């Protein structure tokens, strides 16, 4: 019985360590080790992009887009198991941190940039 209990406890510990834990006060600049989580579920947040000279490069991948209204300042926070994105003007997204859902209200504004052809999609 003790072996089963310890096995279950070990599995739970493995799951918890791969999730965001603890409280995160509202911030526009989450730590580097949390960027993958926050930028996966709402990539239009300004902290997900490095923008210079009219082009923005995604910090997690090789995607380059034209700098426009797609990239928005975002405030993210976490309390218990609730993760929240706040885009201002009453636009926010709250999700269970351990069961995240992709959400991007500005998806239609995304304009990818191609090096060979500066035309956008």
UniProtKB/Swiss-Prot annotation:
InterPro entries: ASFV_fam_110 (IPR004848). Induction: Expressed in the early phase of the viral replicative cycle. Belongs to the asfivirus MGF 110 family. Keywords: Early protein, Glycoprotein, Signal. Pfam families: v110. It comes from African swine fever virus (isolate Warthog/Namibia/Wart80/1980) (ASFV). This is Protein MGF 110-5L. Plays a role in virus cell tropism, and may be required for efficient virus replication in macrophages. Glycans are attached at residues 62, 116. Residues 1-28 form the signal peptide.
